[in-house]
Amino acid sequence: SMGPRAGEEPDLLLRDFYAASALPAGDYSAARSFMTEEAAGDWDPDQQVLIVDSLDIITDAEADSTEGGRSFNVRGSVIGTLSEGGSYSSENGDFEAQIHMTQVDGEWRISDLPQVVVIERTELRNRYQPHSLFFYEHTGQALESDRRWLSTGQESLDTELITLLLQGPAEELAPATMSVVPREANFGGIEDGVYHFTGMSDMSQEDRTRFAAELVWTLSTAGIPGPYQVVADDAPLVEGLDEL
């Protein structure tokens, strides 16, 4: 895991903190390990992640006089954002923040920071991977791909992809797609290699077949090998098909 190194200088510690911010596992536990206990408990970052080209870290000497702490101004050009579901949107803007650090048992820790996750473009490329979700376009004739950036440190990629599939397409894609899955549909997990769903008993055979296609395309494109055994409400998702 990525945590602070003993005796690390505050500016280098801050660099490592921003590298650790590209690891969302455990509600950003790696990034929180660079903060004081109080700051880590109070940090409730916005769901939207900011992507910057690179970060400049400048010592703020004027603010440094306070009780032996250190202050830094952090700046970068915002190039995009990642939604909670991993949808990337291009943006143009500036990120600017002041970070305060203090010593805890002789080690520098971040004591004050903005409520936002900021990662550099290179960290996005190193720590995230683009995957495609597939949804039917509104006529129900063809599949549309919906690109998502997902953290490569995830335990089970298939579970994450299926969860996102049930949540539906990205906002800008939604009007052009058809919804084949009812709101009450739920993914119950994978048991002995079988994908279990509930809340699908009211779906037509046509919609079941469409959801099966969305699922197969999403999993196979992500490199998850088939065939897939898919059960909905204790029966095969598509009647007569034990495997997709």
Task: Locate predicted features.
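Bimodal "functional hotspot" detector
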Residues: 1-244
